[in-house]
Amino acid sequence: MTDTSAIFIIVPTADVTSITSELNYVPASLNSEGFIHACEYHQVAEVVSRFFDNHLALSVLVVDVGLINSPLRYEAPSTTMSSPALFPHIYGALNTDAIVDVCDLVHFKHQPITPEIMAVLRHYRFERLPVESTLFKSTWRSSSNNTHGEPVGTAMIGLYCDSLTSVSCFHKLTFDEVWHFYGGDPLELTLLYQNGDSEQVVLGTDFTNGQVCQYLIPAGVWQGGCLVEGGQYALFGCTMAPGFTGSCFTAGIADALIEAYPNEEKVIQKLSVNGHQTTMPEGFAT
């Protein structure tokens, strides 16, 4: 056993909504074998290659060990694996409130999730933002609308962490956005301006080294963000007035951005988690 803060369950992405909408997860293996198969971070890749169709879209359920109601045992697998390490087995239904994140397998880093990050996930109960997959939680959405039908203001809390690939892809908004730094390690925003210039802004608490705790990003500026290298996580917030709606968001495509901003190719490639998606799903944040 190499990590005790989190275990992971691999499921088809198409099943995630039905799994998380129930109080308990009861897969077929619980009836046929008496337990739910899970794995540690370093076992995920082999489990996927051995037991799942490589054409199937898969997601990884991040399960907080401390929240599991059923007995958890570490046992030898029923089939021979490349490593002699024991596998976590859950002997009973999994209460779904122990699932603190759902990560697309293609973005899973196969790294341990520290107890500090698990504590933040447990407390805030983030969701994944469509297109970007950023861990976020909406904290305020005004009940008053402007003349265009948009909320007069919105606020959210977000979490950047590399071990769960929570970043912001390059995107632009039709309204100004104010960023706030709340805690953890510093984060870096890269801004790409229409005139071809770019800028890096570090949000954090070390103002003597140029970090800022608040920053305004003007409407129409390409913005992307991530944890500063070497950190565990960054907790931040964003507020907008008018408020955020799905229709005010446009994500960038890496090739086009690199052509326009060749000096920022490295960070553009790093943050292009959206692939070819450029718009939020219809009806999101309306």
Predicted stretch roles:
Residues 59-60, 88-92, 214-216, 226, ...:
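Active-site scaffold segments
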